[in-house]
Amino acid sequence: MEKIKIIVASDSIGETAELVARAGISQFNPKQCKNELLRYPYIESFEDVDEVIQVAKDTNAIIVYTLIKPEMKQYMSEKVAEFQLKSVDIMGPLMDLLSASVEEKPYNEPGIVHRLDDAYFKKIDAIEFAVKYDDGKDPKGLPKADIVLLGISRTSKTPLSQYLAHKSYKVMNVPIVPEVTPPDGLYDINPKKCIALKISEEKLNRIRKERLKQLGLGDTARYATEARIQEELNYFEEIVSEIGCPVIDVSQKAIEETANDIIHYIEQNKSK
C-alpha cells in the first residue's frame, strides 16, 4: 500500500488537526497503512499557506487544516481548489454550523481554547516555536522571539533553546558562520533580547574532535583545526560587536547554569 502523507496546518499549535488526523489513520491496518505526518503550526501569512501548498503538490499529501482567521481559511480553500489537492477543513463546517445555530459571529481568534490552561499551553507554544525556528531556519521568527541565541557550532544553542522553551520562553537560535551572512532582521530587533554564546578555543577543539570521532572521521578535518576555529571565533566576535548584545561564556557551564544566567538577564531587562 502506498504511504499516506498528511500535512497538518494550523494558525495555532496544530494539536487539534493532528489528533483528528491520527484518529483517522488509526482506523486502518497500521501494518499496511504506512503514514508520514508533517505539522505546520502558526500559519500566519499567505506565504505560510503557499509553503504548505507547495509541499502538498510535491509529495501528493493530504492537507488537514484548522485555520480560524477567515482570510487564511479562504486563501487555503482557493489554493487547494486551484491545484486540485486533497484536503479536509476540520473547523470550517463546524464553525459555520455553530454560527448559524446561535446567530452570532465567532471570535475568529486562533488558539483561544488554550486559554483554559494558559500556563501549560504557553509552554507548548514555546516548544513548538523552538522547533520551528531552530538553527535560524526562518528569519521571520526573530521579531516574535522572547530570546535570540547566537553562537558558532557546538555551543549548545539547540539544547538551550529547548530547555528555555520548557520554561515558556519562545527562543530562536541563529548559527554564526563565516560563510553565511546573518539575517538582516537580526540587526533590527532589540539587542537586549539577544544572547551570544561564547566558548574557548581549547574547549571547542576538544568537542569537535570528539564529534569527528563519533562520526568515524579523522580529527584532522578542517572543521576541528585551530585555524578554522579561530576564524569562526573572530567572525563571531565581529558580529556580536555589531549587534551590541551580551555574551555568556559557556566553556565551563552546564546547560542548566547557562539557562539560568540567560533567564536572569532577560527578566532584569524586560522593562528597559
Swiss-Prot record:
Similarity comment text for this entry: Belongs to the pyruvate, phosphate/water dikinase regulatory protein family. PDRP subfamily.
EC annotation from Swiss-Prot or TrEMBL: 2.7.11.32, 2.7.4.27
Keyword terms of this UniProt record: Kinase, Nucleotide-binding, Serine/threonine-protein kinase, Transferase
GO MF annotation: an example: ADP binding
Top-level taxon: Bacteria
Catalytic activity: N(tele)-phospho-L-histidyl/L-threonyl-[pyruvate, phosphate dikinase] + ADP = N(tele)-phospho-L-histidyl/O-phospho-L-threonyl-[pyruvate, phosphate dikinase] + AMP + H(+); N(tele)-phospho-L-histidyl/O-phospho-L-threonyl-[pyruvate, phosphate dikinase] + phosphate + H(+) = N(tele)-phospho-L-histidyl/L-threonyl-[pyruvate, phosphate dikinase] + diphosphate
Family matches, as Pfam families: Kinase-PPPase
Protein source organism: Staphylococcus aureus (strain NCTC 8325 / PS 47)
Residues that bind ADP: 151-158
Function, in words: Bifunctional serine/threonine kinase and phosphorylase involved in the regulation of the pyruvate, phosphate dikinase (PPDK) by catalyzing its phosphorylation/dephosphorylation.
UniProt protein name: Putative pyruvate, phosphate dikinase regulatory protein
Upper lineage: Bacteria, Bacillati, Bacillota, Bacilli, Bacillales
